[in-house]
UniProtKB/Swiss-Prot annotation:
Keyword Cell cycle among record annotations: no
Keywords per UniProt: Acetylation, Amino-acid biosynthesis, Aminotransferase, Branched-chain amino acid biosynthesis, Lipid metabolism, Mitochondrion, Pyridoxal phosphate, Transferase, Transit peptide
Alphabetized GO MF terms: branched-chain-amino-acid transaminase activity; L-isoleucine-2-oxoglutarate transaminase activity; L-leucine-2-oxoglutarate transaminase activity; L-valine-2-oxoglutarate transaminase activity
SUPFAM superfamilies reported in the protein's UniProt record: D-aminoacid aminotransferase-like PLP-dependent enzymes (SSF56752)
Targeting signal (transit peptide) range: 1-27
Entry-annotated residues carrying N6-(pyridoxal phosphate)lysine: 230
Subcellular location(s) per record: Mitochondrion
Pfam families: Aminotran_4
Swiss-Prot/TrEMBL catalytic activity: L-leucine + 2-oxoglutarate = 4-methyl-2-oxopentanoate + L-glutamate; L-isoleucine + 2-oxoglutarate = (S)-3-methyl-2-oxopentanoate + L-glutamate; L-valine + 2-oxoglutarate = 3-methyl-2-oxobutanoate + L-glutamate
The protein's name in its UniProt record: Branched-chain-amino-acid aminotransferase, mitochondrial
Amino acid sequence: MSAAILGQVWTRKLLPIPWRLCVPGRCVSSNFKAADLQVQVTREPQKKPAPSQPLLFGKTFTDHMLMVEWNSKTGWGPPRIQPFQNLTLHPACSGLHYSLQLFEGLKAYKGRDKQVRLFRPWLNMDRMLRSARRLCLPDFDKQELLECIRQLIEVDKDWVPDGNGTSLYVRPVLIGNEPSLGVGMVTQALLFVILCPVGSYFPGDSMTPVSLLADPSFVRAWIGGVGDCKLGGNYGPTVAVQQEAQKKGCEQVLWLYGPDHQLTEVGTMNIFVYWTHEDGELELATPPLDGIILPGVVRQSLLDLARTWGEFRVAERKVTMKELKRALEEGRVREVFGSGTACQVCPVHQILYEGKQLHIPTMENGPELILRFQKELKAIQYGTSAHDWMLRV
């Protein structure tokens, strides 16, 4: 696909990104160009995983990575694709000390036609720029970064697995690289992208539901915070709570918020409730994007699909544990599930809340909606159903 055509596609897909804290001039920047991309191919390619070898998430990496450096005096340097290697960072690096760091996660899929396609990458570019502006890290041109990522995948296209449920996970990262212990806007930054082949979240297409610990004493995000940005600092503090959940026999954490115990997220996933609302109407509900919720790409995709079907009400609104408990007691809950790039759609069958186990009848109900979502997403992602959500590599 020519650069001109890609530019037309991206101009249509990419959205303007406002951010009230980063007024013009606060984040000195230039735009790196994909046309200036330098490519250094490795002389020591790694052995690729065998088709029968399990692909554990984040354990195997491809031969190359993308690197772009920035400083406040000259702006962005030329982007380069280089052999995968360790980073050299100053011990006072601000990204290490003060979590001036953000990341993204998206996937490329190889279809039966052997074509590699990225799933809705424009949404990831939008979110990544929003996160960068929240940390006052340098702006970048979303279109140019996406083209650099596309070319990186093209270089390592033989690493894209083609087994059932497999994909190539793409991890862009932007860190402040200030060699100083002061807290403030950085004068140096580093953007890099690494790739890793991953297997299916549910091996063998089995669908294992998860149990959740819902403890209001733990809070993931709050109004006025950064819960709607994909920052490394949002994830580290969840590890201890995840361990607490496992001690109590639960696989994941249901994050609650406020005195009314609003449902917000499941682990690192968005949450959905498919039920008959108390007004008698069949509804798919998910928390609104009010600054607490990460605007997930799969979340948006499920909402878009459901609204296209037009078979039930789709609501972005607050759902409380009181509402959920009452609906369970009245037999109105059909399915509860999480959504995210790693799992796509993950069923929930149990919630431990206030010392009591609440059974969720997700699996007893098919789960019809989850299976329908998964089938539709897979058809789009692997190219069996043509869709403008996919960007061909």
